[in-house]
Regions:
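Short hydrophobic alpha-helices and adjacent helix-cap/hinge residues
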Residues: 1-265
Length: 265
């Protein structure tokens, strides 16, 4: 009887911990991660289990959620989304789009560890271009409205939105506020432009999450995280929303349209 009893016991599946800042409804790209995982032969519920933890847009929930998923030991690897490297390039694009904008604002989250370096990089690029950059901060959903309302007082003619999970999860709110205050804004993800944002420039989030899924599958197959180099996102996308440009009374330069990966009309 013992062999039969053993045979009847379900096989214990390996488990992946999936921690996201957003809520499930705001994270459709999870399917892209699962697709990348599937490329390595793993299918959720069949030969791998996934423990999801959602911060619901709240930074204060992340430490407890991460601790809930923590396992002893191990190393780190992953995909870099070029958070810092692209801010200066976005300033160049904004200046090309609105050449008369001698004063712009940079929206940052003061609770993010990379914020100070992002500010330094943008300020250095602004000095070279002769542009004044005001730093405006929002560390929670409730602060976003008041922060964008302050742009008129600062006489900012453009807005740089930094890459941050909070801003990504509130992209519809940010896009609507930029439209309300008639401020040309450049965003870090194509999802912002799809939501009505004027222009976005940054790595493809779907391509990055696909690679994360592939890495997760490789680790499940026995690869050591330390042996998997942290990859930099190589697919950068420039997305322009002509409908929003028209609403703002802007003409997108041909030099930008010619380089755009996607033009939303």
């Amino acid at each position: 009887m013992l062999p039969d009893a053993i045979a009847e016991q379900p096989t214990k599946l390996p488990v992946i911990g999936y921690l996201a800042f957003a809520s499930p409804g705001l994270a459709p790209t999870t399917a892209v991660f699962l697709g990348g995982l599937g490329e390595t032969g793993y299918v959720e519920g069949q030969n791998v289990a996934i423990e999801y933890r959602w911060a619901e847009g709240r930074y204060d929930r992340l430490p407890a959620l991460a601790a809930d998923l923590a396992r002893p030991g191990g190393n780190l690897t992953g995909v870099s989304l070029l958070t810092l490297e692209l801010m200066a390039k976005r300033l160049e694009l904004l200046s090309e789009l609105v050449p008369q904008a001698s004063v712009v604002a940079q929206l940052v989250n003061p609770n993010t560890s990379t914020t100070e370096r992002m500010i330094r990089d943008v300020q250095e690029a602004a000095r070279v271009k002769g542009v004044q950059v005001h730093i405006v901060k929002a560390g929670s959903e409730s602060e976003i409205d008041a922060t964008l309302a302050s742009l008129a007082q600062l006489q900012a003619r453009g807005l740089l939105v930094s890459r941050d999970p909070l801003f990504n999860s509130r992209r519809e709110q940010l896009v609507a506020l930029a439209a309300r205050h008639a401020v040309p804004a450049i965003y870090p993800w194509g999802e912002f432009a799809a939501a009505g944002g004027l222009i976005s420039y940054g790595p493809s989030l779907t391509a990055a999450l696909r690679q994360v899924g592939i890495y997760a599958g490789k680790i499940l197959k026995g690869a050591k995280p330390a042996d998997l180099p942290v990859e930099q996102a190589t697919k950068l996308e420039l997305v322009v929303n002509l409908k929003t440009a028209k609403a703002l009374g802007l003409t997108i330069p041909q030099s930008i349209l010619a380089r755009a990966d996607e033009v939303i009309e």
